[in-house]
Amino acid sequence: MLGIHVKKTKEELIISWQLAKITIPLRDVIEVTEDATYAGVEDTSAIRIGTAYGTTDRILIKTVKQNYVLFTTNKVSILNAINA
């Protein structure tokens, strides 16, 4: 499992990367956007998922409790899974 895998169910968003599995309740998601900052440094408290170096795209998931930055080279696939 090299990249980030995202699966959306009726109630939650499941993000898998390496041995980590993060579940985010859909009711907590405020916004999903492309992050234009380098290495996701705008929000220093955000949880970073993926390899920051060697990736071209960043996706920011803002939630009620925590923000997540996904480092990927396949943003279209991840955004399609999130917005499905």
Swiss-Prot record:
InterPro entries: PH_SunI-like
Superkingdom: Bacteria
Entries under Pfam families matching the protein: bPH_8 (PF23491)
Family that this chain belongs to: Belongs to the UPF0457 family.
Protein name, per record: UPF0457 protein BALH_2270
